[in-house]
Amino acid sequence: MDGRVAIVTGASRGIGRHIAERFAAEGAAVALVARTVAPGTSRLPGSLDEVVDRILASGGRAAAIPADLTVAEDVETIVARAEQALGPADTLVNNAGVNFYGPALDLPDRRYSVMYQIMVHTPFRLTQLAVPGMVKRGRGWVLNITSKQARHPIGPPYPGWASDGCVAYGMCKAAVDRLTTGLAAELHGTGVSVNALGTSGLVMTPGVAVVSPHTPDNAPVEPDEAMADAALMVCGAAPGTMTGRIVYSMEVLGRPFPDGPWALSMTY
């Protein structure tokens, strides 16, 4: 990653934080995008200031790019602000996500809109803003963070996990998968790769900890660093050899990992 400039959304905590810190440790300058700037200003632990401080203390390069991904004016300036701080971006990681558990028929429109804005519209728009420069320079990497919830449950009869309150979340991640494969086809031959990466198991991020009553008791937990390691491998691959792929962390790392109904293995 030496000499690379990466934009990572949702980088104040959880998977985004781990990816940002790992990329920085490998030599990339990282623009960290999130809403929480200072410690103690969110109900969840983690902030941009803390992640930037850790990266700088380790000898890396990083810049905080505060943004509310539900606000169009914020989204429109992310790429320009990142490039002003660190230089032209050649790597974009669309990681930011949110979920509101509950039956689809009871999901308030406001919550649905927030989910769609953060996980579908913003990745699409950031891609539109960042990728033309990558194409012009002849190289680039787009990594979309997906989920096995994007897959289709098979039934009837349907297993218990099919009614776990994740219909809207799965819809959004399915859109991300289609963005990945479609854009990879459009950009083939330009030197820009587009891939999607999901977790193989449960990652106990601060956000997941809050909604832990909704997680299956038998869900295997993968190491915190697995997604960061896998993201590094995907974004380190030559664009001509790996693009249009939807892969999962432990698969990328070549590590055995239990699968089962909790992980939506019974899918199309």
Regions found by a protein language model. Name each.
Residues L143-G189, G201-V203:
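Catalytic loop of short-chain dehydrogenase/reductase
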Residues V5, S12-R13:
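Conserved glycine-rich cofactor-binding loop
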Residues T127-Q128, T181:
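A short, exposed helix-loop element centered on a Lys and neighboring polar residues
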Residues E26-E50:
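Conserved glycine-rich Rossmann-like NAD(P)H-binding loop of the short-chain dehydrogenase/reductase
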